[in-house]
C-alpha cells in the first residue's frame, strides 16, 4: 500500500469507551439505492426492524429493495432450521423482485447466536441461482459507517479477474466516457487524451453526481477510471486484475482496502480524502504521482474554490470546533475546517486505522502547523462522560456530535451539529466544499440571527436559571 506513516507529533489516546453511534446496518439506507439491482436482507430482531423503519423513513408500501428476516425464539434456541427459513425468504424475494444479488446483513443477534451465514449462503446460492453476499454489519464490532466497509469488503471476491472478451473490455472501459459525453455537442470542450496507465479502481459509495464530478476531474488529468466499487449494478462490477491500482473515497473503508491488497493483489494508493479543495487537490495529485502523470491546473482550481467560499471562511475563522466521534469522517473534516481558520482541540473517533489514514493524518498535522494552531488531541473510542467534562471546560463554539448528545449539549448552551448530516450530504470534491461549510455554519448563523433579535439573551438566561 502506498501510504504515509502516521506522524508522531500527533497525540493518540484510546479511552475504550462504548460505541455511541448509529447502528452500522444503516448502511442499507444508501447502498440499496446505489446498487440498483440488489436486494438487502437484514437478519435480526424486531429492534433492528424498528430502527430501519424509523431511520430510513421509507414506508413498506413503497416496496423498497430491502427487508427484515426477523429472528424468533425458535431461531435463537435452534429449534428452527435456519437454511429452510432463509431459503423460503430468498425464494420469495427472487419471485417478487428478481434481483441480480441478495446481500445478507448480519446483526448483533446473528453474531451472538453464531449463525453460520457464510456456510449457508453458498448452498442456498446454488439452489436458487442468485448470488448471495454476506456482510456482518453488527454493532458489536463496527461503528456507524463501517457497515458499508463490511459490504464492500465482500464484493472483491465477486469481481471478475479479466474481461470475458475484448469487446467486453472495450464496453467496460468506454461506459463512463459515454456517460460524460451525454448531451454534449461536438463543439464542446474536449478533455485531454487519456494516458496509458494501469487500471484504476475507485472504491466507496458516493452519490451519482459526485461520482461524475470526480471522474471528470480525473479525466482532465488524462486519467481513466476503470471501475467503481460498488458499481451501479451488481452485473457491472469492475474487473480487478493483479497489479491494478485502487484508491478509497471514504475514511472508513480500511477493511475493503486490506481485502483488495491481500485477496486481489491490488496496489492501494494512500492519499488524503477528497474533502475540501485542499484534500481534493492532494487526492488527485497523489493519483497522478503514482501513475507518473504530470498534474495540470490543480493549484488554480484550488485557489478558485477558496475564493468562492471566502464568505463562509470569515464566519468560521477563529472559532473552535470539537468532534465527539460518530461516523469516522472526523479527521478529514477537522483538517478542512482547520484550513478554513478554525481551531480543533480534540477529535474523537470510534475507530482509527493509522495505516489507512496515514496520509490524512500527515496532512492534518501539516495543516495545523501551516495555520499556526495547536495540534488536536485524537481520542479513539472516547468515553462520553469524560468528553462532556472536557467540553464543559473548553466551551467550544461548535460540537459535531451524534444525535444522542445534541439536545443535552444544546440545553447547556453549546451549539451542535449532527454528524449524520455529513454522512448523507454530498461532501466530496472541489464542487462540494461550500456544502460542508453550509452545514458547519448553520448553527453559527442561527446564533448570529438570534443575537440580532436579542434571542441570545433569552437563551443564556434560560441556561443560567437551570
UniProtKB/Swiss-Prot annotation:
Q: Name one GO biological process term.
A: light-independent chlorophyll biosynthetic process
Superkingdom of the organism of origin: Bacteria
Q: Name one Pfam family in it.
A: Oxidored_nitro
SUPFAM superfamilies according to UniProt: Helical backbone' metal receptor
Instruction: Write out the pathway annotation from the protein's UniProt entry.
Output: Porphyrin-containing compound metabolism; chlorophyll biosynthesis (light-independent)
Q: Where does [4Fe-4S] cluster bind?
A: 23, 48, 108
Q: Which InterPro entries match?
A: LIPOR_BchN/ChlN (IPR050293), Nase/OxRdtase_comp1 (IPR000510), Protochl_reductN (IPR005970)
Known catalysed reaction(s)? chlorophyllide a + oxidized 2[4Fe-4S]-[ferredoxin] + 2 ADP + 2 phosphate = protochlorophyllide a + reduced 2[4Fe-4S]-[ferredoxin] + 2 ATP + 2 H2O
Give the record's subunit note.
Protochlorophyllide reductase is composed of three subunits; ChlL, ChlN and ChlB. Forms a heterotetramer of two ChlB and two ChlN subunits.
Q: Kindly give the HAMAP family that the UniProt entry links to this protein.
A: ChlN_BchN
Summarizing the function annotation, the protein's role is: Component of the dark-operative protochlorophyllide reductase (DPOR) that uses Mg-ATP and reduced ferredoxin to reduce ring D of protochlorophyllide (Pchlide) to form chlorophyllide a (Chlide). This reaction is light-independent. The NB-protein (ChlN-ChlB) is the catalytic component of the complex.
Which NCBIfam families does this entry report, sorted A to Z? DPOR_bchN (TIGR01279), PRK02842.1 (NF002768)
Homology family: Belongs to the BchN/ChlN family.
Which protein is depicted?
Light-independent protochlorophyllide reductase subunit N
Amino acid at each position: 500500500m502506498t501510504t504515509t506513516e502516521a506522524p508522531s507529533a500527533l497525540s493518540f489516546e484510546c479511552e475504550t469507551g462504548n460505541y455511541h453511534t448509529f447502528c452500522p446496518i444503516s448502511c442499507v439506507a444508501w447502498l440499496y439505492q446505489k446498487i440498483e439491482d440488489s436486494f438487502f436482507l437484514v437478519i435480526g430482531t424486531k429492534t433492528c426492524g424498528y430502527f430501519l423503519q424509523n431511520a430510513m423513513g421509507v414506508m413498506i408500501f413503497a416496496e423498497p429493495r430491502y427487508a427484515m428476516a426477523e429472528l424468533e425464539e425458535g431461531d435463537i434456541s435452534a429449534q428452527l432450521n435456519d437454511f429452510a427459513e432463509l431459503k423460503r425468504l430468498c425464494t420469495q424475494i427472487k419471485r417478487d423482485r428478481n434481483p441480480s444479488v441478495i446481500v445478507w446483513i448480519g446483526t448483533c443477534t446473528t453474531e451472538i447466536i453464531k449463525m453460520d451465514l457464510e456456510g449457508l449462503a453458498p448452498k442456498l446460492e446454488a439452489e436458487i441461482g442468485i448470488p448471495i453476499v454476506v456482510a456482518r454489519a453488527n454493532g458489536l464490532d463496527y461503528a456507524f459507517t463501517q457497515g458499508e466497509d463490511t459490504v464492500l469488503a465482500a464484493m472483491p471476491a465477486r469481481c471478475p479477474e479479466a474481461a470475458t472478451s475484448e469487446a467486453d473490455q472495450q464496453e467496460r472501459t468506454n461506459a463512463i466516457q459515454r456517460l460524460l459525453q451525454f448531451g454534449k455537442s461536438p463543439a464542446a470542450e474536449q478533455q485531454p487524451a487519456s494516458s496509458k496507465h494501469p487500471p484504476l479502481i475507485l472504491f466507496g459509495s458516493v452519490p451519482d453526481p459526485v461520482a461524475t464530478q470526480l471522474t471528470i476531474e480525473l479525466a482532465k488529468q488524462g486519467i481513466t477510471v476503470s471501475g467503481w466499487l460498488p458499481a451501479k449494478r451488481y452485473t457491472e462490477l469492475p474487473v480487478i486484475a493483479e497489479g491494478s491500482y485502487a484508491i478509497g473515497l471514504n475514511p472508513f473503508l480500511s477493511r475493503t482496502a486490506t481485502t483488495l491488497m491481500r485477496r486481489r493483489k491490488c496496489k492501494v494508493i494512500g492519499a488524503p480524502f477528497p474533502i475540501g479543495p485542499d484534500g481534493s487537490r492532494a487526492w488527485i495529485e497523489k493519483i497522478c504521482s503514482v501513475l507518473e502523470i504530470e498534474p495540470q491546473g490543480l493549484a488554480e482550481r484550488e485557489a478558485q474554490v477558496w475564493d468562492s467560499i471566502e464568505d463562509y471562511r470569515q464566519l468560521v475563522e477563529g472559532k473552535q470546533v470539537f468532534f465527539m466521534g460518530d461516523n469516522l469522517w472526523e479527521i478529514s473534516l477537522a483538517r478542512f475546517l482547520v484550513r478554513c481558520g478554525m481551531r480543533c482541540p480534540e477529535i474523537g473517533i470510534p475507530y482509527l486505522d493509522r495505516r489507512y489514514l496515514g496520509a490524512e493524518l500527515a496532512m492534518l498535522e501539516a495543516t495545523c502547523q501551516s495555520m499556526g494552531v495547536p495540534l488536536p488531541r485524537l481520542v479513539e473510542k472516547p468515553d462520553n462522560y469524560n468528553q462532556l467534562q472536557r467540553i464543559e471546560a473548553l466551551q467550544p463554539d461548535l460540537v459535531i456530535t451524534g444525535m444522542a448528545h445534541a439536545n443535552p449539549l444544546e440545553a447547556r448552551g453549546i451549539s451542535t451539529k449532527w454528524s449524520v448530516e455529513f454522512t448523507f450530504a454530498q461532501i466530496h470534491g472541489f464542487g462540494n466544499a461550500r456544502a460542508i461549510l453550509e452545514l458547519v455554519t448553520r448553527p453559527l448563523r442561527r446564533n448570529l440571527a438570534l443575537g440580532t433579535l436579542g434571542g441570545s439573551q433569552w437563551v443564556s438566561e434560560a441556561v443560567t436559571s437551570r
